[in-house]
Amino acid sequence: RPFPLIRNKTLNIGALIAKKSNKKHAKELEFATVQVPSVLPRIVEIPSEKNGERTVILLEEIIERNIGKLFLSNDVVCAHPYRIMRNADLTIDEDEAEDLLVEIQKQLKKRQWGEVIRLEAEEKMDKRLLGILKEEFEIKDTDIYNIPGPLDLTMLMKVYGMEGFDEYKSPKYTPAPVPEFQNDKDIFQVIREGDVFLHHPYMSFDPVVDFVRQAAKDPGVLAIKQTLYRVSGHSPIIAALAQAAENGKQVSVLVELKARFDEENNIVWAKMLEKAGCHVIYGLVGLKTHSKITLVVRREETGIRRYVHLATGNYNDSTAKLYTDCGIFTCDERFGEDATAVFNMLSGYSEPKKWNRLIVAPIWMKTRFLQLIEREAEHAKQGKPAEITAKMNSLCDPAIIAALYYASSCGVQINLLVRGICCLRTGIPGISENIHVRSIVGEFLEH
């Protein structure tokens, strides 16, 4: 009997069973597996013997303790939960793909059955059962993670959602309104009066949604161009873009189909936007479009004016309440020219000869950062004030790290906020003693 196909990231109970027999000789063991149903709640509340106490049991424990009822003619020798993760990378030859959307849809179907790269097993799992799983999944010992507790802790979000524990939760944070956009002033007038900087989630994301909504309805708006990487489930941004197209605006939307684990959602949004009349593009071959930018072209009494929103965070009204990000509204013509150049480039037109304000990757962002670090090093050598403060998701580029080491050795004071991987070592005498690295772990995700 072939080994069953185990779906990616599903929780399963593996068991060794043997035919019931009165004979004393060694029984032949067989492997059996039961998938824990995802349609049932994983946390099951059971009656408590003590007043004021609430007792819960995990669904997999119930199955594990009663698994013998599924194999009545067998003895259950052991039963333990396990979970696998498969390689989720999509293998796409964009040069050969006639339709990127269709090709990604094909690859997504294969994702559930990719190569196994990780096995999570209960720490006390029977070694015979673990050996069978290791052999069948063709993994090494280093790919096996023995967990001293429940597997797949995403279920803790369900615990957080249980009623009756409000006193243990952090008070819900309410973002502050943005002063410039209060009093129901026309959003374009506010931006004309001066650039507006936003810091989410401390400041409300509402002006960003209102910007697209007003652009969709404003009779003076000729065109809206926007990049979308991740959006919320019932996105007001998507609805506004669709409405803009239906109102006769020229709407161009870059939907990044390769946004990791959001591919299926983005395919749905791309089809919906196309159906509404938007021009949907997927970006440059071989590159992922990670920038967040909106360009609104508006006809005014003084002529055509371009309004731009740039941000570090996604156009996602849900995560904007949980992720720390920055954004800016401007109608500075230099930013308008650069934003137009970005969309022309993403649409397949040539790269502009010069950029006014935007630093664009992979064209020259790394080069520019190296220049700025070198500038501070020169300032330090000349006895001038020299300091670098930078915030990033990760730091693992060898050239950037080497440049920071050099700047530190020259006397530059360097403060880094690194959310994730950091390959730079601090405190090395003569090399990195002037570098301080912090990773903030708080109520919000440092995005």
Regions found by a protein language model. Give the residues of each.
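N-terminal localization/anchoring segments of enzymes in phospholipid and broader phosphate metabolism
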Residues: 1-388, 397, 406-410, 420-446
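Cofactor-pocket helix-loop regions in the catalytic cores of large enzyme subunits
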Residues: 393
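Hydrophobic alpha/beta core scaffold segments
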Residues: 413-417
